[in-house]
Regions:
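Signature of N6-adenine DNA methyltransferases within the class I
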Residues: 1-202
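C-terminal substrate-recognition regions of SAM-dependent nucleic acid methyltransferases
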Residues: 129-323, 328
């Protein structure tokens, strides 16, 4: 049995640390690297380190530990996670976290299934504040798993320093928010308010009447502040300078019956109440994913909404009003 599998070691520093600080002998180390320059750097540490460039070659091997930083392109990092879980007793990888907030793709479901009764901790952090020049559209995670683990999963937010415990990855938040009691209770309230209708009911192809032309994408997740996962415009339906009154026939829009309803909808979309609903699921710049809109309540479009009037209409308790106002950044005047 090999002792250590490393995903990605561009300068050979991980291999050097494993040998000098952890006592691994070079013969017990396998490094996946497909860049000849990186392979050369590793060989300068020791020519007895095994290097592979084909992930499939690992299927016949077994390791005590798998560590590293796999390729991030699309869901390729999950292929590496799955392979690591299949061939290693213990896994500790740094990679994108988007898969933790959703469960739509088969590879995401497979990764979570393999992590069941193995994952020990999930650490979320802003990779843009750690890796210079990076532009990650989502927080990074350090995913740690053991050969077998039956205890609660530790959920660590480096952005705030807070820790939580969940029993299963299905209990993970669905967006860039922390599962404290107040936030969870507000999310539950929004889910109750959107059982029969939501703002997504208005979204789609232009139907021929009045409309609000929100942009297809809005907000930025690239932020250098380690205390934030996104910029202040991330949880918005449109920018301050967006042209929402000019139709783009090939783009989705919000369809309403008349211009008064359109103006009412815009006043509502600007409120922190509506933007909190968007924040429950939004983890990318896309503004029209049905999942993102599914928990944004749809009020009557017969008036101009204000921050106070929408909270009063839905009878939001004062403590929850204060929480929503503090969680959603100021953006519109």
């Amino acid at each position: 049995m090999m002792k250590l599998l490393i995903y990605g070691d561009p300068s050979g520093l991980h291999s050097l640390y494993a040998i000098k600080q952890q006592g691994h002998v070079p013969e017990d180390i396998v490094v996946w690297e497909d860049d000849p320059r990186h392979q050369y750097a590793i060989k300068q540490i020791s020519d007895r380190i095994h290097i592979v460039s084909d992930l499939n070659l690992l299927e016949s091997m077994h390791f005590l530990w798998n560590i590293g930083n796999p390729p991030y392109l699309k869901n390729l990092h999950l292929e590496f996670l799955i392979q690591g879980l299949n061939c290693s007793d213990n896994v500790s990888l740094t990679h994108p976290s988007g898969w933790l907030f959703r469960n739509g793709q088969k590879i995401e479901q497979k990764a979570k299934l393999l992590l069941k009764n193995r994952v020990k901790s999930i650490t979320l952090y802003n990779g843009n504040s750690v890796f210079k020049g990076a532009e990650f559209d989502c927080p990074l995670t350090i995913t740690k798993a053991a050969k077998s683990y039956e205890g609660p999963i530790e959920l660590i937010y480096k952005s705030s320093g807070n820790k939580y415990y969940v029993n299963d990855l299905s209990e993970m938040p669905t967006g860039f928010w922390e599962p404290n009691d107040t936030h969870l209770s507000i999310v539950d309230r929004y889910k109750q308010l959107t059982k029969s209708s939501c703002i997504g009911d208005l979204a789609g192809k232009y139907t021929g009447s009045s409309f609000v032309q929100s942009p297809r994408t809005c907000g930025h997740a690239v932020h250098k502040d380690p205390a934030k996962f996104c910029t202040d415009d991330f949880f918005t339906f449109f920018y301050r300078n967006s042209d929402i009154w000019t139709l783009k026939p090939k783009e989705p829009c919000y369809n309403v019956n008349n211009n008064e309803q359109a103006k009412s909808l815009v006043s509502y979309m600007k409120t922190k109440f509506a933007r909190f609903g968007l924040s429950i699921h939004k983890i990318s710049r896309d503004c029209y994913l049905s999942r993102y809109l599914s928990n944004v309540p749809l009020p009557p479009l017969d008036r101009q909404w204000t921050e106070q009037s929408i909270m009063d209409y839905y009878k939001i308790p004062t403590d929850q009003v204060d929480y929503i106002n503090s969680f959603i950044p100021d953006y519109y005047e």
